[in-house]
Design a protein with these regions (language model features):
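Helical hairpin unit composed of two closely spaced alpha helices linked by a short loop
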Residues: 322-324, 332-354, 358-359, 363-365
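CN hydrolase (nitrilase-like) catalytic-core segments centered on the catalytic cysteine
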Residues: 369, 381
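Active-site donor-binding acidic/aromatic loop of nucleotide-activated sugar
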Residues: 384-388
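N-terminal localization/anchoring segments of enzymes in phospholipid and broader phosphate metabolism
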Residues: 1-313, 317, 321, 361, ...
């Protein structure tokens, strides 16, 4: 190497470390989560130069400049028309009233009555209900998905939406720009040309060349005529119905009727304002239901704006409130320290805590990261079940035969801190019983991970898991 080349390389080396140290100081001054700060320091040390690119795309915060602020969120929620029963909180079991208050304060999530609830654990049944809902629409159809692909399932739904738009039904669709980045723009344009209102969330032309990539709308919501709605983990793609790579797809959706649908509607219309700058409101979008059952739900949203993470905060409170059992399902398990400690605390307090994750998910890296977290929870007595019946994509929590949650939220850093997520927290014995039965049915397709098996992992696997864990806040 010539002297000039050596000088250039030396200059680049010192320039890199000057920039890296400046960024590290900047991160520390933000008072960010310690785990995230350490993760970025490890990136700069072990992946020099390339680490700067990773930080540019995934580490810089565009929240203040490009995402709606906390004040705007509050104003939008206040302008949404919701008829709220002020006595509802007194009608749920007393031990959960503090949780309902927490959601009201952290996410302005009203406690709304449920006339009918159906837990859908078969994705083919989800597809049937979806097309039934679309077919029955008289006034409006609102859909929001992270993924909406132009395959057989997606094309069939597109045709159904177009047909309804031509009948004069208002049809609005929000899809995530990154989740659908492989879908040709002509697919969505064909819907627009037919009268469907279509918007993408935080449009990214080149997903890997923008730090907008970091903040995605992961919500899955369907609302028809303000009277019936669905929420859960399913997107619009063939693999959600037919499976993937020879594996069946196991997911959960929750169909709701009654005032609780207004919570789904509110979430959708706030996001609609984000993407279209058009405020849609009025009583025709928020009809008043009978509320004939002593069943209630709160539709809770979380986003990267502000400091409160309402959904994960709700999970932490559920773990603290649990007395008999709490069962959790998630496809990806990379939790933050607070949730992890809460999980262990519940188990060490005598609660039957069961965690179900896929034995093999659709992400090998996520599987390695998940395994690195399981040692602590196993030592605390948490029962970990590895689902081998296919791709487990269900995101559910059920507690003590009364309280349950179904939504889009994974138990990982991305869902907790970066994504726009939504989950329904339901106060109802029948829904809890159905989710409990579903969990126990899934458990038959699992194997229990033992402490001995976990400790006998190969040295190479343990090293790989520990290394990937360093980057779990970034995955």
């Amino acid at each position: 190497m010539s002297w000039s080349n050596a000088a250039i390389m030396g200059a680049l080396y010192w320039l890199y470390w000057i920039i890296a140290i400046f960024i590290i100081i900047r991160i520390m001054l933000r008072n960010r989560d310690t785990v995230k700060t350490l993760a970025w320091i490890m990136v700069f040390i072990f992946i020099p130069f390339f680490g700067l690119l990773l930080y540019f795309f995934f580490g810089r915060s565009s929240r203040k400049k490009r995402l709606a602020g906390k004040r705007l969120l509050a104003q939008l929620k206040q302008r949404s028309t919701l008829e709220v029963n002020s006595d509802a909180k007194g009608l749920i079991q007393s031990e959960y009233q503090s949780l309902a208050t927490y959601f009201e304060n952290s996410s302005t999530a009203s406690l709304l009555s449920v006339d009918e609830a159906e837990v859908l654990c078969d994705t083919s049944v989800f597809a049937e209900r979806l097309f039934e809902m679309v077919s029955s629409a008289e006034h409006h159809i609102h859909l929001q998905f992270y993924i909406f692909e132009n395959d057989e399932f997606g094309s069939r739904l597109r045709d159904a939406l177009v047909a309804k738009a031509k009948q004069g039904v208002e049809v609005r669709l929000i899809y995530d720009s990154v989740g659908c980045w492989r879908v040709g723009k002509e697919f969505f344009e064909s819907m627009r040309c037919a009268g469907v209102y279509v918007e993408s969330f935080l449009k990214v032309t080149f997903p890997l060349l923008s730090n907008r990539f970091n903040y995605r709308n992961h919500r899955k919501i369907i609302v028809v005529d303000g009277k019936v709605g669905m929420i859960g983990g399913c997107n619009i793609a063939d693999r959600y119905i037919k499976g993937i790579k020879g594996m069946e797809w196991r997911d959960t959706m929750l169909l709701l009727r009654g005032m609780a649908v207004n919570g789904l509607q509110q979430s959708f219309l706030i996001d609609w304002y984000f993407v279209s700058r058009t405020m849609v409101s009025g009583k025709k979008y928020f009809p008043v239901a009978d509320g004939c059952r002593n069943s209630f739900a709160q539709v809770v949203t979380s986003n990267p704006v502000g400091d409160v993470r309402a959904i994960v905060g709700g999970y932490v409170k559920m773990l603290a409130l649990a007395k008999g059992y709490i069962y959790l399902q998630t496809p990806y398990f990379m939790p933050d320290e607070l949730f992890l400690q809460s999980l262990k605390n519940a188990s060490m307090s005598g609660v039957d805590v069961r965690l179900m994750i896929p034995e093999k998910s659709d992400s090998t890296i996520a599987d390695y990261a998940a395994m690195s977290y399981l040692g602590n929870v196993l030592d605390a007595g948490v029962k970990v079940y590895l689902y081998s019946g296919g791709m487990l994509h269900s995101k559910t929590v059920v507690c003590d035969d009364y309280l349950s949650s179904v939504g889009s939220t994974n138990l990982d850093f991305r869902s907790f801190f970066y994504n726009f997520e939504v989950s329904a927290f339901v106060y109802d014995k029948a829904v809890a019983q159905r989710l409990k039965e579903s969990f126990l049915d899934d458990q038959k397709k699992c194997r229990l991970l033992t402490v001995n098996e976990y400790r006998q992992r190969s040295f190479f696997k343990r090293c790989a898991e520990s290394f990937i864990k360093l980057f779990s806040p970034l995955l």
